[in-house]
């Protein structure tokens, strides 16, 4: 385990009020990694990838393959190599030796490491983060076009990967996002390192931002 050096940093976010068009500012104090930022972020990112895999690959051993109970030919006198079953691993259609089986994989990672990695990537993502006071400009019904228009008003390009972070996934918003290729929607308390790293633009509501720093607080 590498020795971590952290420092307390205040992240200042400009908040866009969509109704008045004014800009306010809000700041949050957090601890970020200084000397081993790449190490801790890579560790959390790779473990998250491993835990997201479903180890469902499965093969059958000789005893599990159907058939093969009868000896193919007698033990001696044929001139052939001796054989006891047509389901031997040496035969086509036979069992598999040491093949994959479904398994449960667990990798332990400390909560402090997750928090440190998340705050570090959020700090690096500050230039590409847009904070809005609310999503009041969006209709209460399913409308992909309205969502695209809303994002364009924030100068967010849908040619890149966009991540919208909200305090709660509302059904109309979720269904509106589903039809846009490079757009993902995530709830604030489910935010993770991988989502932030892969996104090239972040759109966060003010309430969601408060939930993020409350959920992953140092205390």
Swiss-Prot record:
GO cellular component terms listed in the entry, alphabetical order: chloroplast; ribonucleoprotein complex; ribosome
Keyword match Lipid metabolism: no
One GO process term, biological-process aspect: translation
Basic residues bias: start-end ranges: 68-79
Gene Ontology molecular function: any one: rRNA binding
Gene3D superfamilies attached to this UniProt entry: 3.40.1370.10
Localization terms from the record: Plastid, Chloroplast
Major localization class: plastid
Region entry Disordered, spans: 53-81
Keywords: Chloroplast, Plastid, Ribonucleoprotein, Ribosomal protein, RNA-binding, rRNA-binding
Highest taxon of source: Eukaryota
Function: Probably binds the 23S rRNA.
Family matches, as NCBIfam families: rplD_bact
Subunit text: Part of the 50S ribosomal subunit.
Family the entry assigns: Belongs to the universal ribosomal protein uL4 family.
Protein name: Large ribosomal subunit protein uL4c
Originating species: Cyanidium caldarium
Lineage of the species this protein comes from: Eukaryota, Rhodophyta, Bangiophyceae, Cyanidiales, Cyanidiaceae
């Amino acid at each position: 385990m590498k020795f971590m050096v952290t420092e307390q940093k205040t992240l200042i976010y400009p908040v866009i009020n969509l109704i008045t068009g004014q800009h306010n500012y809000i700041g949050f104090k957090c601890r970020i990694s200084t000397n081993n930022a790449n190490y801790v972020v890579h560790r959390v990112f790779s473990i998250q990838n491993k835990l997201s895999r479903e180890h469902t690959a499965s093969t059958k051993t000789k005893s599990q393959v159907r058939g093969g109970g009868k000896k193919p030919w007698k033990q001696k006198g044929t001139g052939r190599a001796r054989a006891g079953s047509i389901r031997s691993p040496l035969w086509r259609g036979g069992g598999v030796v040491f093949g994959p089986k479904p398994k449960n994989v667990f990798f332990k990672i400390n909560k402090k490491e997750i928090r440190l990695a998340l705050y570090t990537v959020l700090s690096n993502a500050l230039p590409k983060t847009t904070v809005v006071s609310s999503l009041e400009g969006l209709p209460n019904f399913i409308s992909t076009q309205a969502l695209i228009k809303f994002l364009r008003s924030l100068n967010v390009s849908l040619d890149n990967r966009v991540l919208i972070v909200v305090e709660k996934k509302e059904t109309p918003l979720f269904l509106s996002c589903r039809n846009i290729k490079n757009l993902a929607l995530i709830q604030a308390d489910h935010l993770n390192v991988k989502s932030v790293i892969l996104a090239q633009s972040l759109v966060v509501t003010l309430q969601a931002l408060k939930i993020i720093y409350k959920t992953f607080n140092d205390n």
